[in-house]
Amino acid sequence: MMERFPRLAQRVLSVPFTPKYLKSCKKTNPLTSHLMQLRGSQRPIFIQWNLQGRPSVCTDLISKKNYSSATARAGWFLGLGEKKKQAMPDIVKAGDPVLHEPSQDIPLEEIGSERIQKIIEEMVKVMRNAPGVGLAAPQIGIPLKIIVLEDTNEYISYAPKDETKAQDRRPFGLLVIINPKLKKKGNKTALFFEGCLSVDGFRAVVERHLEVEVTGLDRNGKAIKVDASGWQARILQHEYDHLDGTLYVDKMAPRTFRTVENLDLPLAAGCPKLGVC
């Protein structure tokens, strides 16, 4: 099954495979012959903001800035005890062309196939292992229209209550959306710091709509619709952008891009104020 992936791509996706892309897929694609070991020292990435412009909470990854090995050993995110290395795809980093390629729709008849289900399983594993609240297929080197996301009470409990209230951040269970279509609702937007698993170590302010409607198919090929607001709406927009080949840095507010270490510093004069517009 692993060796058949190039033929799957030719038959289903009609995606041109450049040598560079094939090299990337060899390292990241769950349907190639070898799965790479995720580096145990990989540092979590997270999205943070508050109304005073000080960092604290994330969207693409849920983690604390000072992520200690002690908390990791305690299994504080997943309750699974000590984290162990697992064979799974690496997260593709900014600079790889796959992150700027429009993703391909998946034919309905292919959704239930072992190949597509394997991709979904790997995406969920990678997202939770990060740990994170969202992931798009291009982030593991696969230009297909699949996104996965979830936010839990446990994740949210690590953020101050006043901030999660300001974010309108509420838990939701695992969502797998195939061939999603996103519609922005209303005119209200908000400006928050945002980060990405594929842009390690950096953050920037991004304006997002407060309410969206997403339609698509679940992992069984059944039609679904998600009406989201607040933090969940932001996560959906972030992941949906990945399917169009867009990173948050392509939408960031000017002069707000910075390293994680500099998140405590105030924004430059003239930068937009954080919060609901």
Swiss-Prot record:
Cofactor note as given: Binds 1 Zn(2+) ion per subunit.
Single biological process term from Gene Ontology: translation
Any Pfam family matching the protein: Pep_deformylase
Keyword terms, alphabetized: Chloroplast, Hydrolase, Metal-binding, Plastid, Protein biosynthesis, Transit peptide, Zinc
EC id: 3.5.1.88
Residues binding Zn(2+), per UniProt: C196, H238, H242
Cofactor(s) this protein cannot do without: Zn(2+)
Subcellular location: Plastid, Chloroplast stroma
Active site (catalytic residues): E239
Xref: HAMAP family: Pep_deformylase
Cross-referenced PANTHER family: PEPTIDE DEFORMYLASE (PTHR10458), PEPTIDE DEFORMYLASE, MITOCHONDRIAL (PTHR10458:SF2)
Listed name of the protein: Peptide deformylase 1A, chloroplastic
Species classification: Eukaryota, Viridiplantae, Streptophyta, Embryophyta, Tracheophyta
Underlying gene: PDF1A
